[in-house]
Design a protein with these regions (language model features):
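Register position in tetratricopeptide repeats
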Residues: 49, 83-86, 120, 154-158
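Soluble extracytoplasmic domains of inner/organellar membrane proteins
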Residues: 100, 104-122, 126-134
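Terminal, low-structured helical/coil segments at or just beyond the last alpha-helical repeat
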Residues: 126-161
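Long, contiguous interaction/recruitment modules in multidomain scaffold/adaptor proteins
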Residues: 1-25
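The canonical alpha-helical register within tetratricopeptide repeats
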Residues: 25-28, 62, 99, 133
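Alpha-helical adaptor scaffolds
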Residues: 7-12, 37, 42-49, 54-104
């Protein structure tokens, strides 16, 4: 059997969806599947990517109502709210990070964010503790290691002054 030529309708390249088109596709999916946690979370991340923080916060809130214990969601959600509050992690972002810390006190990402919250509250000793623990848990080759090392160095320099 020799393979036949592909029909001309399948021969054309499929153009990837733009981020805006993807967002609309996700929204359409959620109309039929409003309890789809993963899609709400993905929609929130896509909305952050295009700078639509208010809508992303709403999407993350919907995901949170479905699964309030997903650590990645808690961090994404807190980051979106903080970005909407000019980088401030006080209030709800802090509550979400504290919840994530209670769920997984060994998570490097959670420890990093907990350090940010502590630093925003001028609790430099606590920020240092969180970041040192994150570094201890993190492999030397981890690509984000330098970010935490720089944050820790900043704290140490502030404590010396």
């Amino acid at each position: 059997l020799a393979p036949k030529a592909m029909p001309s309708s399948l021969d054309k390249s499929i153009e990837p969806l733009s981020l805006s088109e993807s967002i609309e596709t996700l929204k359409d999916h959620l109309i039929e599947n409003p309890e789809d946690f993963s899609t709400w979370k993905m929609l929130g991340m896509a909305q952050v990517a295009i700078g639509n923080l208010d809508d992303s916060i709403d999407s993350f809130e919907n995901a949170f109502e479905i699964n309030p214990d997903d650590i990645d969601l808690l961090l994404q959600y807190s980051s979106a709210i903080a970005a909407n509050q000019e980088g401030q992690f006080l209030g709800k972002p802090q509550d979400l990070i504290e919840k994530a810390l209670a769920i997984d006190p060994q998570s490097i990402q959670v420890l990093y964010f907990a350090g940010i919250v502590a630093a925003h509250q001028a609790d430099l000793d606590l920020a240092k503790e969180y970041w040192q623990k994150a570094l201890y848990l993190m492999p030397d080759s981890h690509p984000d290691r330098s970010v935490i090392e720089e944050a820790l160095e900043t704290i140490l320099n502030l404590q010396v002054k």
